[in-house]
């Protein structure tokens, strides 16, 4: 590269054949400035050449060793003014205050772009505006030309000048790549010179492989270059110029470019060459880009079913077939022809459902957690779309019901291939409320009607209050001393007496349990009402009194007494027979059938003893029937206290 200092005296002969071409303005005034990526050149001569140094000679501004740049590529000159000669004490110098006395002549075979307008080799000299940009084709090498007027020469050293080597003011569209990252970037030269966010993400199928950026340091000159380009481009766009200034890659697919070209044709058809011409005319990016985009155009025309090939008639001159758009899809394609595509690298999905979403941040494959439905409530979109979350049931006012914690296992459906949530179970703890409390069940215990007694028989109703899930134990106290076991209907009805009143006693866990018994007198039951009973068994008066434990809560169905292995006096084992089922009169069994049904269908559940003694084996009850047969009845009973038992034996 040429040095940043101004060159004077040495250089190419003046263009246009004027005399005094080598002279310099008095005082070394700079009349123009050439600014590149890594250099700044102050023009103090009438003519300046730009190219690359070679054995055939040197140039004023060397642009390196790129093969796309000729040895003598550009020449910037000013015409001689006022017929001054070389011997004149004050040579003719450009009139920078005029602002339009600088011309450019293209000498290179590849031509040059001046503010996006191509200038070919051998074209007439182009009068330059006050500020313009040169770009060499097939490269991203740019030079900014700035004409310096007499009023601006004094401001040349001001800090606010954009050409001063100050710290770069990073623009939102500028990509600053450190030198240490240079080896990671593609070495291919970029066919476009505009560094923009849209161009940094290739939008065509071949964009990623056909273009790249040559890494260099971002200098203030690049920033001023983009700032200087913005005003002329906007002015020309406002004036309705045909040639767009933006030479960045257009955000359209190849199919969209083809549709644009065909629809803008007068007869709605174009040849392949006509499509190429339309694209290069409207999008300067494809003028200097790699020719691979033309192959993509041909492939789209051949493979896309929306494009129809129409042979050329023999009367029409030229060669090549025409291409048209399928009339059935023309309206839809034209509507989408100018719809800009989203640049690559921009996320096109949203994550509205938090961290468990399968697209946002997938959880670790080894992660399995327990979520509480009351605390977190986190769910995946898949679970929300397929089945609802189990909602907890609120307890009724005034009711204290125990709740059971149920752990359920749920597997989330797979939303994307390879999702780690598809194979790992997630446990959800759900609080479920048990069914409402069962109302108190009424048991009717009747004195035997076959026992001769002078006192009228008394029927007492016992209300048993239950609490879920514990099994209630109700003791009946205050009944007659006689113990009668009546086999009626489908079960065994038992009447017993408790010698000791129930008292609240501490249990193993420190809690107290209190048994509530409500006794209500009811009308006596006559022998006629129990006439349908199949068999009545009466025990003797001397039988020791036992305490009966009633186990509640079982569904109705086939009722049988539980079969147990019981011992009598700890000596031998007697099998437990099953109660005989028989038909019973509905009218007579209304009080007895209820107790028999619940007692026979109850499950055998362990209960705690109120007196805290060691559990003893249940005693076997042998009674004699009227016909002399013996029936063995096993009862889960609690033995009376020792003092009461001794007293009963003495009696």
Curated annotation (Swiss-Prot):
SUPFAM superfamilies: SMAD/FHA domain (SSF49879), Winged helix' DNA-binding domain (SSF46785). Residues 194-203, 373-383, 601-614 have a biased composition (Polar residues). The keyword Nucleotide-binding does not apply. The modification Phosphoserine is found at residues 24, 230, 364, 389, 415, 419, 590. Pfam families: FHA (PF00498), Forkhead (PF00250). Residues 249-344 bind DNA. There is a cross-link at residues 152, 155, 518, 624 (Glycyl lysine isopeptide (Lys-Gly) (interchain with G-Cter in SUMO2)). Transcriptional regulator involved in different processes such as glucose metabolism, aerobic glycolysis and autophagy. Recognizes and binds the forkhead DNA sequence motif (5'-GTAAACA-3') and can both act as a transcription activator or repressor, depending on the context. Together with FOXK1, acts as a key regulator of metabolic reprogramming towards aerobic glycolysis, a process in which glucose is converted to lactate in the presence of oxygen. This is Forkhead box protein K2. It comes from Mus musculus.
């Amino acid at each position: 590269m040429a040095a940043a200092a101004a060159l004077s005296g040495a250089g190419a002969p003046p263009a246009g054949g004027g005399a005094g071409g080598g002279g310099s303005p008095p005082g070394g005034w700079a009349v123009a400035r050439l600014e590149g990526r890594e250099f700044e050149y102050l023009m103090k001569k009438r003519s300046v050449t730009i190219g690359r140094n070679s054995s055939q000679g040197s140039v004023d501004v060397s642009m390196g060793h790129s093969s796309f740049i000729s040895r003598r590529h550009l020449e910037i000159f000013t015409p001689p003014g006022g017929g001054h000669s070389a011997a004149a004490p004050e040579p003719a110098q450009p009139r920078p205050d005029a602002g339009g006395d600088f011309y450019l002549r293209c000498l290179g075979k590849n031509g040059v772009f001046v503010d996006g307008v191509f200038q070919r080799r051998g074209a007439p000299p182009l009068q330059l505006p006050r500020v313009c940009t040169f770009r060499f084709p097939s490269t991203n090498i740019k030079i900014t030309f700035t004409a310096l007027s007499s009023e601006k020469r004094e401001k040349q050293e001001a800090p606010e000048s954009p050409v001063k080597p100050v710290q770069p003011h990073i623009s939102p569209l500028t990509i600053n790549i450190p030198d240490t990252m240079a080896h990671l970037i593609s070495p291919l030269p970029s066919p476009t010179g505009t560094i923009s966010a849209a161009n940094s993400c290739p939008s065509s199928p071949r964009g990623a492989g056909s273009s790249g950026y040559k890494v260099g340091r971002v200098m203030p000159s690049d920033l001023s270059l983009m700032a200087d380009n913005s005003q002329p481009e906007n002015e020309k766009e406002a004036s309705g110029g045909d040639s767009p200034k933006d030479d960045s890659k257009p955000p359209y697919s190849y199919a969209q470019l083809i549709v644009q070209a065909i629809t803008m044709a007068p007869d709605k058809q174009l040849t392949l060459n006509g499509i190429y011409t339309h694209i290069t005319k409207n999008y300067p990016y494809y003028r200097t880009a790699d020719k691979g985009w033309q192959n993509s155009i041909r492939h789209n025309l051949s493979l896309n079913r929306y494009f129809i090939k129409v042979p050329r008639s023999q009367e029409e001159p030229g060669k090549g077939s025409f291409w048209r758009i399928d009339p059935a899809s023309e309206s839809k394609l034209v509507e989408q022809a100018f719809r800009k595509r989203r640049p690559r690298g921009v996320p096109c999905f949203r994550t509205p459902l938090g961290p468990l979403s399968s697209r946002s941040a997938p959880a670790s494959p080894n992660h399995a957690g327990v979520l509480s439905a009351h605390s977190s409530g986190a769910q995946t979109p898949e679970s929300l779309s397929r089945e609802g979350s189990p909602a907890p049931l609120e307890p009724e006012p005034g009711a204290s019901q125990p709740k059971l914690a149920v752990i359920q296992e749920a597997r989330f459906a797979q939303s994307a291939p390879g999702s780690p949530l598809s194979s790992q179970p997630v446990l959800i703890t759900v609080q479920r409320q048990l069914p409402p409390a069962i109302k108190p069940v009424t048991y009717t215990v009747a004195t035997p009607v076959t026992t001769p007694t002078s006192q009228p028989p008394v029927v007492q109703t016992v209300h048993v209050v239950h609490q879920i899930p514990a099994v209630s134990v109700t003791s009946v106290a205050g009944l007659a001393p006689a113990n009668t076991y009546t086999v009626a209907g489908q079960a065994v009805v038992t009447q017993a007496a408790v010698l000791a009143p129930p008292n609240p006693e501490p249990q193993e866990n420190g809690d107290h349990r209190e048994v509530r018994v409500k006794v209500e007198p009811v009308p006596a039951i006559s022998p006629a009402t129990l006439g349908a009973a199949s068999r009545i068994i009466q025990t003797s008066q001397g039988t020791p009194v036992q305490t009966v434990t009633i186990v509640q809560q079982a569904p109705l169905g086939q009722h049988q007494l539980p079969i147990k292995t019981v011992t009598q006096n700890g000596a031998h084992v007697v099998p437990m027979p099953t109660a005989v089922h028989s038909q019973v009169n509905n009218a007579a069994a209304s009080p007895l059938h209820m107790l028999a049904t619940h007692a026979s269908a109850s499950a055998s559940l362990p209960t705690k003893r109120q007196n805290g003694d060691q559990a003893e084996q249940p005693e076997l009850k042998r009674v004699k029937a009227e016909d002399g047969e013996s029936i063995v009845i096993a009862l889960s009973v609690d033995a009376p206290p020792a003092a009461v038992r001794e007293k009963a034996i003495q009696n």
